[in-house]
Regions:
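Long, well-ordered alpha-helical scaffolding segments within enzyme catalytic domains
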Residues: 78-92, 158-195, 298-322
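Terminal catalytic/cofactor-binding subdomain
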Residues: 1-131, 138-142
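Loop-rich catalytic cores of soluble enzymes, especially ATP-dependent carboxylate-amine ligases
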Residues: 8-9, 105, 117-136, 140, ...
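Long, well-ordered mid-to-C-terminal structural blocks that present hydrophobic/aromatic surfaces
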Residues: 251-353
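Flexible loop/turn segments at secondary-structure boundaries
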Residues: 35-36, 106-107, 155, 292-296
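Short, glycine/acidic-rich hinge or "gate" loops at secondary-structure transitions
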Residues: 96-109, 159-164, 323-330
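Sequence termini and other peripheral, non-core segments
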Residues: 1-54, 325, 329-473
């Protein structure tokens, strides 16, 4: 199927930029001196079993900040900004959010790394299993999961313009399988541009651990990061093959359950992986973004915009090998880039040139003029590795240290959250009373929808209970 032609059809073009975005971001809590926090998850956030925005991941100290689904990257980041304000002002005053993917100095004894104290006992047992199987230290690495969905209106228009597939849900699944394969093939570019875990703190790797020759571009996205064992192999040739392989891995005891399968891209349908045959793929989750320490949110708007155009490119461009070989080549290239020195020119310049040139051609063909500036900015970095995130980090680390970099930015962002203590980042144009109300609602875990910003009209929901609030009363 020629998606390039489909995307240029007159009826499709008005919809090409329509998409839905969501983001999950992990941060370790640390002391203001850069040591792992020893306190429990703050009780001020209420119960983790239902909180829509602030959870814990593997450990008791690892916050997970979750945005609601948004219709633009700007709207998603706006809410992420607000959640950060709430999180930073709610943790103990001698703590901060550690701004790096690699954790701060960890305790010498693994027993002192506390697994998240959750109400659901099966969730605790699962974390204990992960600790035993992969080690606690690898679980302490943090990153960003970027959720992306092509708008249903775009999918429908693409479907209407073709005749090969006769069911829209099947067509949507076909689209996402192609995009997932292309992402796995070309994800080396994301690792190159946004990799940000060049070094680890002393003691992160044990003496007997296999470990990289630091610095590298991204420990987290290399074989030294968190991943399944080598005998776990899953095909992306089709959704059926993907699910069959994972099911077989569970049956053979190579995975404890389906959710243990960990990959740079995850196919999402319902709540469980087993829902996928019924729901089809609704969106995909990109799991290979390191935290950008040069942003108080761990990610900047240009990166979100670039990822949006990159997702369009992955639909636009053809696959050039059989599915499994295509993905395998991507694994090899990604490892090569992840293990490279942050200031070293990569060997994939020619392929990088092709990707960027084709992205610019695509933006021209689809009339997306505003995208060329963002794509051009990152194209400049292809031959200037010192300008990438890991490149800039290494420049600082050489003169100082990794922990100093984390301390400086972590403390700076923590202080910034208190500069306007009665205002809420992302919503500062609203009335002060509404901002204070929103802060409390986010902190306590009420789902929020802004129905009319001019009128200060909000919808709050907890479970089945709904309240409408105007002017914060």
């Amino acid at each position: 199927m020629n998606y390039r032609e489909l995307m240029q059809k007159k009826n499709v073009r008005p919809y090409v930029l329509m998409a839905r975005f969501g983001l999950e971001k992990e941060n370790q809590r640390s002391t203001r001196e850069g040591l792992l926090a020893t306190t429990d998850h703050p009780t001020v956030f209420g119960n983790r079993s239902y909180h829509p925005y602030i959870q814990t991941d593997f450990s008791e100290t690892q916050l997970e900040l979750i945005t609601p689904v948004a219709n633009s990257g700007t709207e998603m980041l706006r809410f992420l900004d607000a959640i950060h304000d709430v999180a930073r002002r709610s943790i103990p005053e001698d703590e901060m959010l550690w701004p790096l993917s690699m954790p701060p100095q960890l305790p010498t004894k693994d027993e002192e790394i506390k697994i998240a104290k959750l109400d659901q006992y099966d969730a605790v047992l699962y974390r204990r299993y992960l600790a035993k199987e992969y080690g606690k230290r690898k679980q302490m690495v943090s990153g960003i999961h970027f959720n992306f969905e092509y708008d249903q209106a775009l999918i429908q228009q693409l479907y209407d313009e073709q005749s090969e597939v006769t069911d829209c849900k099947q067509f949507k699944t076909k689209v996402y399988m192609k995009v997932a394969r292309n992402f796995l093939r070309y994800r080396w570019l994301i690792t190159y541009l946004f990799g940000a875990s060049p070094v680890s703190e002393d003691g992160y790797f044990r003496v007997y651990d296999d470990q990289p020759q630091e610095p590298i571009r991204s420990i987290r996205n290399s074989t030294y990061g968190y991943r399944n064992h080598d005998n776990v192999k899953v095909s992306y040739a089709s959704l059926e093959r993907y699910l069959e392989d994972i099911h077989r891995m569970v049956e053979n005891g190579l995975l404890s359950e389906e959710k243990e399968f960990y990959a740079p891209v995850r196919l999402r349908g319902g709540k469980q992986m087993s829902d996928l045959p019924k729901t089809g793929i609704r969106y995909i989750e990109l799991r290979n973004l390191d935290l950008n320490p040069f942003s108080r949110l761990g990610i900047v708007e240009d990166t979100v915009d670039f990822l949006h155009y990159f997702m369009l490119y992955l639909l636009w461009t053809d696959e050039k090998e059989e599915a499994d070989e295509w993905v395998k080549t991507g694994d090899i290239f990604n490892e090569q880039v992840a293990l490279g020195h942050p200031h070293e020119t990569i060997k994939l310049i020619a392929e990088g040139d092709r990707i960027f040139s084709e992205m610019i051609d695509m933006l021209d063909a689809l009339g997306i003029r505003k995208g060329k500036e963002v794509v051009g900015k990152y194209y400049q970095q292809l031959r200037n590795p010192q300008d990438t995130v890991s490149g800039k980090m290494w420049t600082i680390i050489q003169e100082n240290s990794n922990s100093e970099l984390g301390n400086i930015f972590g403390n700076q962002y923590q202080s910034m959250a208190f500069e306007r203590p009665y205002q809420l980042a992302g919503f500062r144009e609203m009335e002060l009373s509404t901002q204070i109300f929103l802060f409390d609602a986010i902190q306590k875990g009420l789902e929020i929808e802004i129905l009319d910003e001019q009128e200060q009209f909000l919808k709050l929901q907890h479970g089945e209970h709904i309240e409408y609030v105007k002017n914060a009363n």
